Amino acid sequence: KKITINLAPADLPKEGGRYDLPIAVALLAASEQLTASNLEAYELVGELALTGALRGVPGAISSATEAIRAGRNIIVATENAAEVGLISKEGCFIADHLQTVCAFLEGKHALERPLAQDMASPTATADLRDVIGQEQGKRGLEITAAGGHNLLLIGPPGTGKTMLASRLSGILPPLSNEEALESAAILSLVNADTVQKRWQQRPFRSPHHSASLTAMVGGGAIPAPGEISLAHNGILFLDELPEFERRTLDALREPIESGQIHLSRTRAKITYPARFQLIAAMNP
């Protein structure tokens, strides 16, 4: 039997296995193998194995945030439990198999919610007290942190420019819950495994001076966030500033002014947040 599946709207690009679970549930409902009257109240996100087991997908925290904002419940894979649990709101459910999801939708089984113990706590950051001397440099960091300014450190090699820059996050105000969710949502798109470890930590990104323009601002057929977006609500540290390509540095002008980056590619146009403090270091 041939089955045609239509994913609308057709002009939006669709990639990855995140649609496996909703497609499977839709097929079961359309063929009357699943009797559930409240499917419209749920968002379903997850990749299916051949056995019907649910697998985690990137960006689950973004999906959960938007679903809750729209007043709907969301069901994700157990692998995404720690990530979604950071939202700490009602309306999130986790499951490990398609059969479990179907039983829940039919009212025959209860699904677990992400546990509070999945919530991570901030870890200690580098302490400015570790820096001996450099009174002018430390004073500059304090002014930078207080005013949200950008900073250029100039000095000979070995004078502690990198050490000073890495300690700025330790004197910045803690992330609010909204800021922490924004940063976690961006990070989950590229490295979901570290979301819980870095929860409520100010991002600190230090790309090498050989980093390409795409690595810095983001890109790809369906644009992924780059270093400037991964530094959102945190710090972007550019060591050896003159060694970066001219066009890479020019690309930072718009994000510094607007706090976001617009990426236009053939298959998608995406805007990522990119509100960061720029700390640069160079030799005289």
Where are these regions (language model features)?
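Peripheral, non-AAA+ core regions of ATP-driven protein-machinery
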Residues: K1-L152, P156-M163, S264
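Walker B catalytic acidic pair
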Residues: N233, D239-L241, A251
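P-loop NTPase nucleotide-binding/switch module
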Residues: H109-I143, G147, P174-S229
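Short loop/turn elements that form and flank the Walker-type P-loop nucleotide-binding site
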Residues: N38-L39, R69-A70, S88-K89, A146-G148, ...
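AAA+/SF3 P-loop NTPase mechanochemical coupling elements
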Residues: F204-R205, P223-N233, L263-N283
